[in-house]
């Protein structure tokens, strides 16, 4: 069976894969393979200062060890900078973006919502971030797990950064351009990115790009409430007995794997997942405590 479905897993090489990463990878992989779709891997290496040496290689080796097979070559955002620059120039020329010289200290009292200080200031681009003007509109979409999501861009976000002051490109711009370039039809990722999606919908609309379907899976959190992640030194996935964490990941996604699946191979665990995948079983919640799995 084949389909037009194109999914992707897009890790950031600021550390190694951990259990939270695995849950997102399993969800995106099974959602694609269950319908005969393609599954791509993309390195989101936008921020060289934060990249851990050797992490890209380690991530790919872990995916292979855990039985994942991707289609085509691994793409890297660091090779796409000219495409991002071209779109930023286009947005600046059309007046849809502008230079912003605000410091973090100037903005610290605004709870992450940009107040528009530089919107009409006409600053030069030197030593400035680039922000995208947002409309006073509410954006809605229906997530396949989390249901309807609404966000008023003007009131809840404000004009947002698409290129940082240090010249590095922002995630919101890069992810939209790369998903369109790769023909991604379905985005399956962690629920921490749920509130980024309306910004991405706006960019897609602005640039005339097609809108993919979205599915946001619960984040795995530690007892203190922090999500599993590189910032909190979550342990990397074990090199051996990959079927054990794979089976736990299936349970985190609401699937019902037999206990003996953990005693087999990684390939067997993923094959079971593909054959029995049911996205409607994924818990409709933003987080899941790791100790409950």
Swiss-Prot record:
Cofactor note (record): Binds 1 zinc ion per subunit.
SUPFAM superfamilies reported in the protein's UniProt record: Nucleotidylyl transferase
GO cellular component terms, A-Z: cytosol
GO biological process: glutamyl-tRNA aminoacylation; tRNA modification
Keyword Coiled coil: no
Chain positions recorded as Zn(2+) binding sites: 100, 102, 114, 118
GO molecular function, one term: glutamate-tRNA ligase activity
Broad class of enzyme this protein falls into: ligase
Motif ('HIGH' region): 11-21
Protein residues bound to L-glutamate: 8-12, 44, 171, 189
Recorded superkingdom: Bacteria
Pfam family, one: tRNA-synt_1c
Function, in words: Catalyzes the tRNA-independent activation of glutamate in presence of ATP and the subsequent transfer of glutamate onto a tRNA(Asp). Glutamate is transferred on the 2-amino-5-(4,5-dihydroxy-2-cyclopenten-1-yl) moiety of the queuosine in the wobble position of the QUC anticodon.
Homology family: Belongs to the class-I aminoacyl-tRNA synthetase family. GluQ subfamily.
Name of the featured protein: Glutamyl-Q tRNA(Asp) synthetase
Organism: Pseudomonas paraeruginosa (strain DSM 24068 / PA7)
Gene: gluQ
